């Protein structure tokens, strides 16, 4: 998703007559469904709320004796990408902020001093959190973060897509 525009695609199923796309709004706790006929009709576009988590389920179906017979669903959680911003920074602390995402269970915050490796979970935050204060930063000036929204669904934790951001620590020289 991007700015509320949801673009879905999936692999075609060889013996399918079509697909059912079910989109569950995790904030409103309501679902909507649409049937797409045709084996190769494996893309769907729609507008959704930008700061809301969704559970998307795609089922292939086949007509048997005048009834749709569905496959097992394929679930994925999606949301608008989070943008992280530096609210305040000093030589040893940094406060990172993001826009609230509705319909999730919480956030995992990971940090590293390298963009490619060494990420460790720094914090687990509640669903209402919109910022985190990071202490004991290194002197390199670069700290890389990613904030991963998650949702508990049927007893299992599912994580959402995320981006890695580089934040700079502000230094004061006397």
Region spans (language model):
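Pro/Thr/Ser/Gly-rich low-complexity, intrinsically disordered linker/stalk tracts
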Residues: 1-15, 67-103, 139, 155-174
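Conserved hydrophobic/aromatic "anchor" residues
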Residues: 10, 19, 54-56, 61, ...
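Residue-level signal for short segments within beta-strands and strand-turn junctions
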Residues: 12, 23-27, 60-64, 111-115, ...
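Extracellular low-complexity, O-glycosylation-prone stalks/linkers
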Residues: 13-34, 101-123, 129
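Hydrophobic residues at beta-strand termini and immediately following loops
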Residues: 36, 125, 134, 167
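Short S/T/G- and acidic-enriched coil/turn segments that sit immediately N-terminal to beta-strands
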Residues: 39-44, 128-133
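Beta-strand-rich modules
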Residues: 45-68, 134-155
């Amino acid at each position: 998703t991007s700015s509320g525009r949801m673009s879905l695609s999936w692999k075609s199923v060889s013996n399918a007559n079509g697909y059912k796309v079910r989109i569950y709004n995790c904030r409103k706790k309501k679902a909507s469904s649409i049937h797409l006929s045709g084996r190769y009709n494996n893309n769907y576009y729609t507008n959704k709320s930008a700061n809301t988590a969704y559970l998307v389920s795609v089922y292939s179906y086949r007509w048997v004796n005048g009834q749709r017979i569905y496959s097992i669903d394929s679930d994925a959680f999606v949301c608008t990408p989070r943008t992280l911003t530096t609210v305040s920074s000093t030589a040893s602390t940094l406060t990172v902020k993001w826009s609230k995402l509705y319909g999730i269970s919480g956030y995992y915050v990971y940090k590293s001093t390298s963009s490619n490796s060494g990420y460790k979970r720094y914090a687990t935050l509640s669903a209402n959190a919109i910022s985190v204060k990071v202490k004991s930063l290194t002197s390199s000036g670069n700290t890389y973060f990613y904030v991963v929204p998650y949702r508990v669904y049927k007893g299992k934790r599912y994580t959402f897509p995320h981006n890695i951001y580089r934040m700079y620590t502000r230094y004061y020289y006397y």
